[in-house]
UniProtKB/Swiss-Prot annotation:
Biological source species: Escherichia phage lambda (Bacteriophage lambda)
Annotated Pfam families: Phage_NinH (PF06322)
Name this polypeptide is given: Protein ninH
Classification via InterPro entries: Phage_NinH
Family statement drawn from the similarity comment of this UniProt entry: Belongs to the ninH family.
């Protein structure tokens, strides 16, 4: 099985900068595309086989575990 992993900036290059087209391909809002447009390293999102996956943040419990 082959996996395709991209980021929103990668898709914007393919769509010639058209945020609306990227949003249509990902079945999300243009606002969501704008939210991740600067995440070039994919630390907060990834697109795996044309499905957008996002990191929703750290919980208080996770923050406490990371401190220890």
């Amino acid at each position: 099985m082959t996996f395709s992993v991209k980021t929103i900036p990668d898709m914007l290059v393919e769509a010639y900068g058209n945020q609306t087209e990227v949003a249509r391909r990902l079945k999300c809002s243009r606002g969501t595309v704008r939210k991740y447009v600067d995440d070039k390293d994919g630390k907060m999102h990834a697109i795996v086989n044309d499905v957008l996956m996002v990191h929703r943040g750290w919980s208080e419990r996770d923050a406490l575990l990371r401190k220890n």
